[in-house]
A protein has these predicted regions:
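PP2C/PPM-type serine/threonine phosphatase catalytic domain
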Residues: 1-265
Length: 265
């Protein structure tokens, strides 16, 4: 599904995207099942996160991809799934065409390629209990697209308003207190079983906007108000990423936490 989250307006000058990425294993988990795609890079399959934020500053001309993956599965299957998706994103982004029409079809095709890569990784591991979420931004010189599969999230902060752009793919049936709802979609589902439908939202790229991609290790620890407050108090992307991760750890750090914070100038 494709939705517009702001109206049309021409962008007369080129904008610059600034971004920082940080990942932490958390205080409870024995391994980091998160991964990311950031400035052409991802983490190794076996990792404990990043000690310091990765940083990107780039004039927006052709498309820029940023993505967070949250793997799931027993043993080391979560790490394998997230790494397989991040690696495939590297391959997909190395061949991004300069002009894309229509963008929705391109974004959907990338998601399908990521899904197939995780399905193949599961086959090699002889398991069906492997998958990963995806939350991504695709930024062009005029537009920004938020794309997700699963419950990792994408947000925009504009003029003090914190808006969720992603859509959680979770079971709506009520569960016992303390239990998280099951995912209805994720990367790693065999197309013969279910054809995934990525949620895609489109908006105009405007100077002053801030964006956040994150795994549920952040939003399970912090409220939207707390996240907004941290982002408003930390206008620079690197300190903001560090402050968000530290706040999640201070609240208990029960899960891996990965964030990508972006600013548009």
């Amino acid at each position: 599904m494709l939705t517009d989250f702001i109206g049309e307006r021409k962008q007369l000058m080129k904008l610059t995207l600034e971004a920082a990425c940080l990942s932490n294993r958390g205080k409870i988990r024995g391994s980091n099942e998160d991964n990311f795609y950031f400035d052409g890079r991802c983490m190794p399959q076996d990792n404990n996160g990043l000690r310091n934020p990765a940083y990107l500053r780039q004039e927006v001309s052709s498309g820029i991809w940023l993505a967070v993956f949250d793997g799931m599965g027993g043993e080391n299957f979560g790490e394998t799934a997230a790494f397989a998706a991040a690696q495939e994103m590297q391959r997909q982004c190395s061949a991004v065409p300069r002009f894309l029409t229509p963008e929705k079809d391109y974004l959907t095709s990338v998601c399908m390629a990521l899904n197939n890569a995780v399905v193949e990784a599961a086959r090699q591991q002889a398991t069906t209990h492997m998958g990963t979420t995806l939350a991504a931004l695709y930024v062009t010189h005029r537009s920004v697209y938020a794309c997700n599969v699963g419950d990792s999230r994408a947000y925009r902060l504009r003029n003090g308003e914190f808006l969720q752009l992603s859509q959680d793919h979770v079971d709506s049936r009520p569960l016992r207190e303390g239990r998280k709802p099951a995912l209805t979609q994720h990367l790693g589902i065999d197309p013969e079983e279910l054809l995934i439908e990525p949620h895609i939202a489109k908006g105009q790229l405007l100077a002053g906007d801030r964006y956040l991609l994150c795994s549920d290790g952040l939003v399970d620890m912090l409220t939207n108000f707390e996240i907004t407050d941290i982002m408003l108090r930390n206008p620079d992307v690197e300190p903001c990423a560090e402050a968000l991760v530290q706040a999640a750890l201070d609240k208990g750090g029960r899960d891996n936490v990965t964030v990508i914070v972006c600013g548009v100038e």
